[in-house]
């Protein structure tokens, strides 16, 4: 079993398959597909623990967004651990991470974003022409139109109307947001 799992080409393919499934959303990549294509001589019972170990290592590396010094320390620890990986496997994992780190990181960033984004904002100030109360007619109102959409799809528009009090509340909240961002951006 150990000899069959040592091949660097097969391990590189396995890591690519795991990355495609875990980080790039290709859900058709199953453990049976990986085993039959890359390790056909290994039984499913022997392959499962190896697959789980490699999946865990890859997820640990990606979730920590390891730089190459951290990666080297992590892989060295894995080679010294009982039931860990071999130094040849560590070399393949290191090479794989060096070649795929940027794409995996971008994919994780895209997965963590809110789907829709603000594409545009327009506003104007009008005089209110209709109201239940006659005293509110001809009072100024701010009308804001937000264009919201996902990339590659048609936008949706949201129209908001604010009186003077609501504009003041909105500006106060935006000032609080700006202050929080400024606080977080200051060097420690």
From Swiss-Prot:
Q: Where in the cell is it found?
A: Nucleus; Cytoplasm; Endosome membrane; Cytoplasmic vesicle
Q: How is it modified after translation?
A: Ubiquitinated; undergoes both 'Lys-63'- and 'Lys-48'-linked polyubiquitination. Ubiquitinated by XIAP, leading to its proteasomal degradation.
**CDD domains given in the database record:** Commd1_MURR1
Superkingdom of the source? Answer: Eukaryota
Keywords, ordered alphabetically: Copper, Cytoplasm, Cytoplasmic vesicle, Endosome, Membrane, Metal-binding, Nucleus, Protein transport, Transcription, Transcription regulation, Transport, Ubl conjugation, Ubl conjugation pathway
Q: Where does Cu cation bind?
A: 100, 109, 133
- Give positions of region: Required for binding to PtdIns(4,5)P2: 124-188
Tell me which residues make up the COMM domain: 117-185
GO BP annotations of the record are: copper ion homeostasis; negative regulation of NF-kappaB transcription factor activity; negative regulation of protein localization to cell surface; negative regulation of sodium ion transmembrane transport; positive regulation of protein ubiquitination; protein transport; regulation of proteasomal ubiquitin-dependent protein catabolic process
The main location class comes to: nucleus
Q: Name one GO cellular component term.
A: early endosome
- Assembly information from the UniProt record: Component of the commander complex consisting of the CCC subcomplex and the retriever subcomplex. Component of the CCC (COMMD/CCDC22/CCDC93) subcomplex consisting of COMMD1, COMMD2, COMMD3, COMMD4, COMMD5, COMMD6, COMMD7, COMMD8, COMMD9, COMMD10, CCDC22 and CCDC93; within the complex forms a heterodimer with COMMD6. Interacts with VPS35L; the interaction associates the CCC complex with the retriever complex. Identified in a complex with an E3 ubiquitin ligase complex composed of TCEB1/elongin C, CUL2, SOCS1 and RBX1; in the complex interacts directly with SOCS1 and CUL2.
According to its UniProt entry, what is the function of this protein? Scaffold protein in the commander complex that is essential for endosomal recycling of transmembrane cargos; the commander complex is composed of the CCC subcomplex and the retriever subcomplex. Can modulate activity of cullin-RING E3 ubiquitin ligase (CRL) complexes by displacing CAND1; in vitro promotes CRL E3 activity and dissociates CAND1 from CUL1 and CUL2. Promotes ubiquitination of NF-kappa-B subunit RELA and its subsequent proteasomal degradation. Down-regulates NF-kappa-B activity. Involved in the regulation of membrane expression and ubiquitination of SLC12A2.
Describe the family membership recorded for this protein in Swiss-Prot or TrEMBL: Belongs to the COMM domain-containing protein 1 family.
Tell me which disease this protein is linked to.
Answer: Defects in COMMD1 are the cause of copper toxicosis (CT) in Bedlington terriers, a genetic disease occurring with a high prevalence worldwide and is unique to this breed. In Bedlington terriers the biliary excretion of copper is impaired.
State what protein this is by name: COMM domain-containing protein 1
Organism (species): Canis lupus familiaris (Dog)
Q: List the gene name.
A: COMMD1
């Amino acid at each position: 079993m150990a000899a069959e799992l040592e091949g660097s080409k097969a391990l590189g393919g396995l890591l690519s398959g795991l990355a495609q499934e875990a980080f790039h959303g290709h859900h058709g990549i199953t453990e049976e597909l990986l085993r039959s294509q890359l390790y056909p001589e290994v039984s499913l019972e022997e392959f499962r623990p190896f697959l789980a170990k490699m999946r865990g290592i890859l997820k640990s590396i990606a979730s920590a967004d390891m730089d190459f010094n951290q990666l080297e320390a992590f892989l060295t620890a894995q080679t010294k651990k009982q039931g860990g990986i071999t130094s040849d496997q560590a070399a393949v994992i290191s090479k794989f991470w060096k070649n795929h780190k940027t794409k995996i990181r971008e994919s994780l960033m895209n997965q963590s974003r809110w789907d829709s984004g603000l594409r545009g904002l327009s506003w104007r100030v009008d005089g209110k022409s209709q109201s239940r109360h006659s005293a509110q007619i001809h009072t100024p109102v701010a009308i804001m139109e937000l264009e919201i959409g996902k990339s590659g799809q048609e936008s949706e528009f949201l129209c908001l109307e604010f009186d003077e009090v609501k504009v003041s509340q909105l500006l106060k909240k935006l000032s609080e947001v700006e202050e929080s961002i400024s606080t977080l951006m200051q060097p420690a």
